[in-house]
């Protein structure tokens, strides 16, 4: 299961492929540590893009529809009836396609500023025959072309990477319906470093040092990293104008937050 089944919760190839990309980008990391200027997501070796998608996919398959969406207040019923959803920072579109398959009455829009990933998302949707209720576009998290009147806006393991997470959340709030919901999936993390010095936390800190933090620094961002913690994510949501924020559910690897206008 760990080596042969891409949908298995213990599938490891995605993690190994991501790690392989780190060795291929060694010279870039040396420069990043020398200058502190950062390194954008799209400047990494392409193994990172595919490896990250393969790493997250089993977790999303096992939890997104079965537990994460049901943990949100009133969202599942809206999706069953027919809702409008924006998946911000969708990458290869794994999360977008899973939701589109599970809720055929709803319309899903996947957005990411990394064009090669969006092309992969489009191709995957075609392969799976999911084209009627899903669309993908290469735009940034605050691009006006994203539109508005969304019932649900999602950020899957990406808000902490952004150069302007408050700006992204402000734009999300403006794009939601008054009774809409923002679902923020973040890596499992406590608020203090010493509370995160476990197996999962150490893995996230290591990857974050090479991927998440440099990406944010490249845009002069706050460099939250993959172990930002609940307090920091709540502060960002409140600074963006959301009035309600709660931890909806969690797994050993992720925390699912719900924010409402």
Q: Which ranges hold each PLM region?
A:
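Class I SAM-dependent methyltransferase SAM/SAH-binding core
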Residues: 84-86, 96-142
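Core SAM-dependent methyltransferase catalytic element
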Residues: 241-261
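A short acidic, Gly/Pro-enriched loop at the edge of an enzyme's catalytic core
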Residues: 142-153
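A short glycine-rich, Lys/Arg-flanked "PGG" loop and its adjoining helix->strand segment in the class I
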Residues: 166-178
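A short SAM/SAH-binding and catalytic strip from SAM-dependent methyltransferases
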Residues: 151-165
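Conserved Class I S-adenosyl-L-methionine-dependent methyltransferase catalytic core
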Residues: 1-83
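C-terminal alpha-helical "lid/dimerization" subdomain adjacent to the S-adenosyl-L-methionine
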Residues: 185-239
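Class I SAM-dependent methyltransferase "Motif I" SAM/SAH-binding loop
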Residues: 89-93
